[in-house]
Amino acid sequence: MADGPVSGGREELTLYTRRGCPLCEDMAAHVRALLSGTPHGLTPVDVDADPALKAAYGWDVPLLFHGASEICRHELDLPAFQEWLRAHS
């Protein structure tokens, strides 16, 4: 199984979020800034739009994933994110 989605050499991170979540907005902004200049992308997914995701994560957002691997939750764990970025550069 692959670590995460890849599209033309570009690896996608998934940010599980919900509308009106300030922590989600903060994490999205920080991750986008840190990914700037890299081939990687960020795909936000609203957990409220999918009953299975809403049941799985409830209010436990934001969550940042690469494929099935969780990188961090609730706030950006900069050391963990930088470790992921080094491993995927």
What are these regions (language model features)?
Residues L35-P39:
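Short helix-capping segments at alpha-helix termini
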Residues H40-P51:
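Thiol-based oxidoreductase modules, predominantly thioredoxin-like and allied folds used
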Residues E70-D77:
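N-terminal, polar/charged subdomain of small-to-medium soluble alpha/beta proteins
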Residues F81-S89:
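Thiol-/selenol-based redox modules, centered on thioredoxin-like
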Residues A2-A33:
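Local sequence-structure signature of Cys/Sec-based thiol-disulfide redox active-site neighborhoods
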Residues V61-E70:
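A short, hydrophobic beta-strand/beta-hairpin element that forms part of a small beta-sheet core
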